[in-house]
Structures are given as structure tokens and as C-alpha cells.
């Protein structure tokens, strides 16, 4: 069991925010994020939010053609994945002219920026004067629908969306600071936003992350 404090989360997301700015990624640039249930998912999502970069979470079930569709549909400038999807991204890169930056979490690979390397090189504080200003109505997240009857559709969420989930935490989940909250969803589904991310963080609850392979009835 590895424990991370709220202070750890803030500092780690600050490092990634600084890394984004150092790379030249700007406010309004879409970033494809396909990560499992690991702490780095939080660092990336919050770092994007702090810099105005538009995170596009994707489920870990996505294949190369699905990644290509999402990158091209949103004109994504950045892809942040693990080795599980690195080869698929490389396979479709030539078809994605807007894709300029590749970030690999948990490993090193030729042609990729290692997440750990770019973050450790940055400060764990952000200079508020250099951070882009974001407004409540500006785009913060893009989710894609499941595409049951046609191609997946983009669904945008603005910066006010996060604060709106205080209602989710208070009146639906009844979250308290003393609670330990566990949501099993994949990080690419919208449920992750209101199960893994905003309500428990707003409430100050502890969040349990477990990234086992598949669903084990005895364990879960």
C-alpha cells in the first residue's frame, strides 16, 4: 500500500503543470490522456486544469483506430499514455498532423518524453503570475461518448463542472473528510470525474486506487 497526501498531489500536479508550459503546450490545447488507475492520472488531470490544457480522458480499452479518431476529431496536440498504448500511438502518428508531443508514464521509450523525467526537472510550486487565466465557462475536459449507434461524440465540460460536483459529493455520495472512497470505473469514462476525482477531492476524503487486471469477484 502506498499513501499519497493532498500536499503530495498538489506538488506533483504543479510539477506536471510546469512541465507542460516548458514543453510549449498552451491553454486550449487538447491532450489525449489514456492512463490506468494510478496516481499519475491525478497529476495529469490536475496539471492540465491548472494550465488550461484540455484533458481528453480515454478508456484503456481503446485501440489504435480509436486513438486516431479522437486525436483527429479534437486536433489533439499531446498524448499521455503508458507502454500499453505507446505502440498504438506510434502506429497512427503519421495520420495525426496536430500531434506534437508524446509523454510516456512509467517507462522510457525513444521518441517519447518520460513523464517522470520531465516532472522531476520542474519545481513543485507554480508561479501564479505565469499560469494562464481560466474562466468558469471555458473548456476544461472533453469526453467521448460510447458511440453505440455511430462514431463517438465529443462532450465538453467547462471549469465550473468540477465545482458543480460538490453537490454530487454532498447529496448523492454523502462524502465526509473521514471517508475512504473507492470507485471501480476506468479512468476514461465520465464516471471517473464524479467518482474518482472531483467529489472526493472537494470533500477531502481519502481515495482508494486499485489497478488490478480484470474484475476479480473475490477481491472486489
Regions found by a protein language model. Name each.
Residues 1-46, 63-68, 116, 120, ...:
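Conserved AMP-binding/adenylate-forming core of the ANL superfamily
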Residues 104, 110, 122-144, 151, ...:
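Conserved pre-ATP/AMP-binding loop-to-beta segment of ANL
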Residues 1-23, 27, 51, 86-87, ...:
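N-lobe entry segment of adenylate-forming
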Residues 31, 48, 79, 139, ...:
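Conserved S/T- and glycine-rich ATP-binding loop of Class I adenylate-forming
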Residues 3-7, 140-164:
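Conserved AMP-binding A3 loop
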Residues 163-183, 187-220:
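Conserved AMP-binding/adenylation subdomain of ANL enzymes
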Residues 22-23, 46, 50-120:
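Structural core segment of the AMP-binding/adenylate-forming
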Residues 35-46, 61-65, 185-202:
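Conserved coil-to-alpha-helix start sites within the AMP-binding
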Amino acid at each position: 500500500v502506498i499513501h499519497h497526501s493532498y500536499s503530495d498531489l498538489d506538488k506533483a500536479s504543479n510539477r506536471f503543470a510546469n512541465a507542460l508550459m516548458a514543453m510549449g503546450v498552451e491553454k486550449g490545447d487538447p491532450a489525449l490522456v489514456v492512463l490506468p488507475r494510478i496516481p499519475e492520472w491525478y497529476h495529469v488531470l490536475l496539471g492540465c486544469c491548472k494550465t488550461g490544457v484540455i484533458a481528453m480522458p480515454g478508456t484503456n480499452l481503446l485501440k489504435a483506430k480509436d486513438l486516431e479518431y479522437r486525436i483527429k476529431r479534437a486536433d489533439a496536440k499531446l498524448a499521455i499514455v503508458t507502454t500499453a498504448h505507446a505502440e498504438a500511438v506510434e502506429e497512427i502518428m503519421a495520420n495525426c498532423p496536430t500531434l506534437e508531443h508524446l509523454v510516456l508514464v512509467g517507462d522510457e521509450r525513444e521518441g517519447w518524453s518520460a513523464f517522470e523525467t520531465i516532472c522531476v526537472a520542474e519545481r513543485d510550486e507554480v508561479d501564479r503570475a505565469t499560469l494562464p487565466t481560466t474562466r468558469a465557462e471555458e473548456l476544461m475536459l472533453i469526453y467521448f461518448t460510447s458511440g453505440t449507434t455511430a462514431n463517438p461524440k465529443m462532450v465538453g465540460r467547462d471549469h465550473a463542472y468540477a465545482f458543480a460536483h460538490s453537490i454530487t459529493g454532498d447529496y448523492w455520495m454523502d462524502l465526509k473528510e473521514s471517508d475512504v472512497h473507492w470507485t471501480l470505473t476506468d479512468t476514461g469514462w465520465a464516471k471517473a470525474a464524479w467518482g474518482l476525482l472531483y467529489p472526493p477531492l472537494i470533500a477531502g476524503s481519502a481515495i482508494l486506487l486499485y489497478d488490478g487486471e480484470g474484475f476479480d469477484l473475490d477481491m472486489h
